[in-house]
Amino acid sequence: MEIRTVVGANKQVEESDISKLPYLQAVIKESLRYHPPGPFLMRRKDGDDLEIKNYVIPKNAAILINIWAIGRDPRIWPNPDSFEPERFFNREVDFKGHNFELIPFGAGRRICPGLPLAYRMVHLTVASLIHNFDWELEPGITPQDVDLNEKFGLSLKKAIPLKAVPTKP
């Protein structure tokens, strides 16, 4: 409803509308926390050896960062297995590499170079899809049947698909 209220029924979503859609922004952050684009980030330890709590990380070591586990850590996210976009209303967290509890695109010098474009395109695309389609489950599928669990692989796929129905002929 937020999108149709802000944008209106007879207009298309524009980039300037995105800043007026806080719930959409929260849904996208929560989606990236709950279903990151990939489960891991790979980094290489530059510089000298590093010791953390009596564990030595050697220079040039490959480091695997489990961003899926960070997004499901109850010490960081209350009710981590629950999809709750509202958690971002009172929490200043972005996914642009500044907050390490939400780093789906990496951080620092190795952050995804396409992030500025992806940020705009994801918001604009999701807002346009919500604005222009009514979303419904396939016949015979109830909301209780929807399983948001992933199947592990190079990409994370949803187990039960949704059907997009155009709102305008």
Predicted regions mapped to residue ranges:
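Juxtamembrane membrane-interface segments of multi-pass membrane proteins
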Residues: M1-N10
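Cytochrome P450 heme-thiolate "Cys pocket" and heme-binding signature region
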Residues: N90-M121, D147-K151
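Conserved cytochrome P450 K-helix/beta-meander segment immediately N-terminal to the heme-binding cysteine loop
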Residues: I18, G47, I65-V93
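Hydrophobic, repeat-rich solenoid/adaptor surfaces of innate immune receptors and signaling proteins
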Residues: A61, N66-I67, V122, V126, ...
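Conserved cytochrome P450 K-helix E-x-x-R motif and the immediately C-terminal K′/meander segment
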Residues: K11-Y55, P74
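Cytochrome P450 heme-binding "Cys pocket" and the immediately downstream C-terminal segment
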Residues: L115-L154
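Hydrophobic, well-ordered secondary-structure elements that form the walls
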Residues: S31, I57-N60, F83, G108, ...
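C-terminal helix/juxtamembrane-tail motif
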Residues: A62, W135, G153-P169
